[in-house]
């Protein structure tokens, strides 16, 4: 199984890019991981929120491959502790045949088409974070889950 992360828009801040790359490199010791960045929609000032979600949704769905298991990072999704998330990933490693793909949506969330294509929704917190920050936090949580599953001394209860 591979893990994929689809995000909308590039990461601008160098310190986030550096930290994201650090955790992406660490993850490669445990599981194949890829992050796909969908470019920001151009001329968003001329679009309604719904139109922007639709355009982003089309690009998200286009990035999927046959057999992908789609999980949305959504404020209304199921919340996990780090230990619970590691168990969740372990189960998915045994049941998802190809790619487990997580998606961070755009500023207004997901289109109905993306919600319909998704198998699950998970939430990292009831708080709101910037899209750039959530990428780092989520990749770190995947790394943390891998260290938990391998009984390595990274996570402390």
Swiss-Prot record:
An example molecular function term from Gene Ontology annotations: rRNA (pseudouridine-N3-)-methyltransferase activity
Main location: cytoplasm
Record's keyword terms, sorted: Cytoplasm, Methyltransferase, rRNA processing, S-adenosyl-L-methionine, Transferase
Alphabetized SUPFAM superfamilies for the sequence: alpha/beta knot
InterPro entries: Alpha/beta_knot_MTases (IPR029028), RlmH-like (IPR003742), tRNA_m1G_MTases_N (IPR029026)
Superkingdom field: Bacteria
Any one GO CC term of the record: cytoplasm
Catalytic activity from the UniProt record: pseudouridine(1915) in 23S rRNA + S-adenosyl-L-methionine = N(3)-methylpseudouridine(1915) in 23S rRNA + S-adenosyl-L-homocysteine + H(+)
Pfam family, one: SPOUT_MTase
Enzyme Commission number(s) from the entry: 2.1.1.177
Subcellular location: Cytoplasm
NCBIfam families: PRK00103.2-4
Similarity section: Belongs to the RNA methyltransferase RlmH family.
Function of the molecule: Specifically methylates the pseudouridine at position 1915 (m3Psi1915) in 23S rRNA.
Complex formation: Homodimer.
Protein name (Swiss-Prot/TrEMBL): Ribosomal RNA large subunit methyltransferase H
């Amino acid at each position: 199984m591979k893990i994929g992360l689809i995000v909308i828009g590039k990461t601008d801040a160098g310190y986030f890019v550096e930290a994201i790359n650090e955790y992406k490199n660490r993850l490669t010791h445990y599981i194949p991981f890829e992050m796909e960045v969908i470019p920001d929609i151009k001329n968003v000032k001329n679009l309604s929120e719904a139109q922007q979600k639709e355009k982003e949704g089309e690009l998200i769905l286009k990035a999927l491959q046959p057999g992908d298991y789609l999980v949305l990072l959504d404020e209304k999704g199921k919340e996990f502790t780090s230990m619970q998330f590691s168990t969740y990933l372990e189960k998915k490693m045994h049941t998802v045949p190809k790619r487990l793909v997580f998606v961070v949506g755009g500023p207004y969330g997901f289109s109905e088409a993306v919600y319909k294509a998704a198998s699950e929704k998970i939430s990292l917190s009831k708080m709101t974070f910037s899209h750039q920050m959530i990428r780092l936090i989520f990749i770190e949580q995947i790394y943390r889950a891998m260290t938990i599953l391998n009984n390595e001394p990274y996570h402390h209860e």
